[in-house]
């Protein structure tokens, strides 16, 4: 079951967001939380756009069911996730206060612009998340030590034929992290795939099983 909402704050930017609760949701039970950051093409004020890709696409179009709480905020038009780091962290805080979230199992993922946003948000507060999965995002190599020192589990996907965000962005990010002794980061190469590595990542059971197995 998914629903559309607006998050408001007196001191932070406001977001529209989509929320998914598992079948037979029990408010007395703790659930993993998956936070999804969409790409540049899904910005604006139409939440249907924010469900074009990723796990919510398969909930909406195919009736797929997942064992986690899902929230997908929507980035305003012509803006970038990097503009909203503090607001996103406050948003996550509120979600954890209002829903029965297992705070040892908070996962962050995103695609393209949202993949870059995933890197940025994780670097701002690496201890917040049990694992991250940046999909075809631009790397931030010079801050690789932050994630390496936090030993944050990371699973990347990238198409080797991506001409929008080149494959080397993820490859270089992996090298930057591993250079500092991180041993729980990996990159899955989608051979022959362009920018749409998300179509492979979010239908890959390996990613979901790996993510849900991570706990702080």
Residue locations for each model-derived region?
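Alpha-helical scaffolding within the catalytic cores
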Residues: 47-62, 137-148, 168, 172
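Short, proline-enriched alpha-helix->beta-strand connector loops that line the catalytic pocket
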Residues: 66-68, 149-154
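A domain-start/cap signature at the N-terminus of enzymes
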Residues: 1-33, 109-111, 116, 121, ...
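Alpha/beta-hydrolase
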Residues: 35-37, 135, 190
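C-terminal catalytic histidine-bearing segment of alpha/beta-hydrolase fold enzymes
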Residues: 155-157, 161-216
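Primarily recognizes the serine-hydrolase "nucleophile elbow" in alpha/beta-hydrolase
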Residues: 96-98, 104-149
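Gly/Ser-rich "nucleophile elbow"/oxyanion-hole loop immediately N-terminal to the catalytic nucleophile
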Residues: 23-29, 76-113
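Active-site machinery of serine-nucleophile hydrolases
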Residues: 33, 37-89
């Amino acid at each position: 079951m998914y629903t559309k909402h607006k998050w408001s704050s007196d001191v932070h930017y406001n977001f529209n967001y989509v929320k998914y609760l598992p079948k037979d949701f029990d408010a007395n039970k703790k659930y993993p939380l998956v936070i999804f950051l969409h790409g540049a093409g899904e910005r604006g004020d139409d939440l249907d756009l924010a469900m074009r890709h990723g796990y919510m696409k398969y909930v909406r179009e195919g009736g797929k069911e997942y064992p986690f709480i899902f929230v997908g905020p929507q980035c305003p038009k012509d803006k970038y996730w990097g503009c909203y780091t503090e607001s996103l962290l406050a948003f996550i805080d509120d979600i954890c206060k209002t829903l029965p979230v297992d705070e040892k199992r908070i996962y962050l993922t995103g695609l393209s612009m949202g993949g870059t946003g995933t890197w940025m948000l994780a670097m701002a507060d690496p201890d917040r998340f049990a694992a991250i999965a940046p999909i075809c995002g631009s790397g931030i190599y010079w801050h690789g030590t932050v994630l390496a020192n936090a030993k944050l589990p990371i699973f990347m996907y990238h198409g080797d034929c991506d001409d929008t965000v080149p494959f080397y962005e993820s490859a270089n990010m992996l090298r930057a992290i591993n250079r500092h002794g991180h041993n729980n980061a990996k990159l899955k190469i989608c051979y022959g795939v362009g920018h749409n590595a998300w179509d492979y990542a979010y239908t890959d059971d390996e990613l979901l099983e790996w993510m849900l197995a991570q706990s702080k």
